[in-house]
Amino acid sequence: MPSPHFSKVLVFGATGEVGSAVALEAHALGAHVSIALRDTTKHNEWISPSQEHAADLQRISADLTDPDSLKRAVHDTGAQAAFIYAVRSKDTLRGAITALRDAGIQYLVFLSTSQVRTAGTTKGDIRSIKPDHFIPWQHAQVEIALEELEVPHAAVRAGFFASNPLRIYLDRSSEPKQVNLLAPEVPHDPIDPKDIGRAAAAVLVNPRLYASGYQGEPKKDVVYLSGPALLSQTEQWEIINRELVAAGKPEVKVNHITVEQYLENLAKLHVPDVVAKSLAKSMVETRALYAPEDYEKSRGNVELLTGRKATAFDEFVKREIPRYFD
């Protein structure tokens, strides 16, 4: 294996489904990986203790809302590059980005969202996204901060998480389990969060920015990631129920709901209203996001970056059934 461009990396969000995959894949690519945690004793449901030990993951105390902790983390680990994600902060992570840069981080990979492409008044202009479309606006603000602070970076603009139907929308409190679908026939591009993490790790450890022949912006690499097939929520749940039956488990009851009911359900889950409304908007307005000329390019990027085909939705469901239905 060739030596990695960055041999020491710092990964935030490693107790989540994407960050955990970033950490493990960065190790597999030859980097020494430190995982930044607010609570270094926190249980990690995505990386087992044996995996953490085998990958020699170093737990370090750091918080993206605490710039001083970031400076200490970089100094203590000697990290040259870091993976970050959007967290709620008054300055849209400008303080965190500045602290990481000033402490010695040379390059950042930011987990963004593909929604930023079409959420603004002008396609592709992240500065034209309004705050009321909160999710893409929040991610766009971090990208803008990275640009204005002149930090070399990659914006990994990921599509619809394949885990959303199971992690967010499945009601496991009812019997039989049920799901309430808003805009069931609208297409989405479900992508395995592990594929997102692996692709992000590839551009974290060996950035395309520094590869010979790179022709993009000098300090910004934009990476769009989509799943291998466009599927409506109806099609997704047909697949989920088929795999449940094959596994000897009861099917999930599928209900169709209005926007008002969708917002009520998210309110019960204590999702902030501004986030809930942005989620509703993103569930309904996807056709521009998956324009053929854009989707055909992004669907191949997982394989391009990782050398492995993107996980099909049915394969993802088979793998995750024990997590959500046992």
UniProtKB/Swiss-Prot annotation:
It comes from the Eukaryota. Induction: Expression is repressed at alkaline ambient pH and highly induced under nitrogen starvation and acidic pH conditions. Signal peptide: none annotated. Disruption phenotype: Leads to decreased production of bikaverin. NADP(+) binds at G13, A14, T15, G16, E17, V18, F161, A162, S163, N164. Keywords: NAD. The keyword NAD applies. The keyword NAD applies. Gene3D superfamilies: NAD(P)-binding Rossmann-like Domain. InterPro entries: Ergot_Alk_Oxidoreductase (IPR051604), NAD(P)-bd_dom_sf (IPR036291), NmrA-like (IPR008030). Belongs to the NmrA-type oxidoreductase family. Nitrogen metabolite regulation-like protein involved in the regulation of the gene cluster that mediates the biosynthesis of bikaverin, a red pigment also considered as a mycotoxin. This is Nitrogen metabolite regulation-like protein bik4. It comes from Gibberella fujikuroi (strain CBS 195.34 / IMI 58289 / NRRL A-6831) (Bakanae and foot rot disease fungus).
